[in-house]
């Protein structure tokens, strides 16, 4: 079955499908989504 293009989760680098029904997209899981949120809150990510 063809689900479309694959991308990598920006946190753990696991491959996920673009068209897959994923509540946590663009992350692969709730854990990766929370890790990303923490990185924003802690100041690791910055907008210039």
Curated annotation (Swiss-Prot):
Inhibits all the catalytic activities of DNA gyrase by preventing its interaction with DNA. Acts by binding directly to the C-terminal domain of GyrB, which probably disrupts DNA binding by the gyrase. Its cofactor is Zn(2+). GO terms for molecular function: DNA topoisomerase type II (double strand cut, ATP-hydrolyzing) inhibitor activity; zinc ion binding. Keywords: Metal-binding, Zinc. GO terms for biological process: regulation of DNA-templated transcription. Pfam families: YacG (PF03884). Binds 1 zinc ion. This is DNA gyrase inhibitor YacG. It comes from Wigglesworthia glossinidia brevipalpis.
């Amino acid at each position: 079955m063809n689900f479309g293009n694959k991308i990598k989760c920006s946190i753990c680098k696991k491959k996920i499908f673009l068209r897959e029904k994923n509540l946590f997209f663009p992350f692969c899981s709730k854990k990766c989504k929370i890790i990303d949120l923490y990185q924003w809150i802690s100041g690791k990510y910055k907008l210039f």
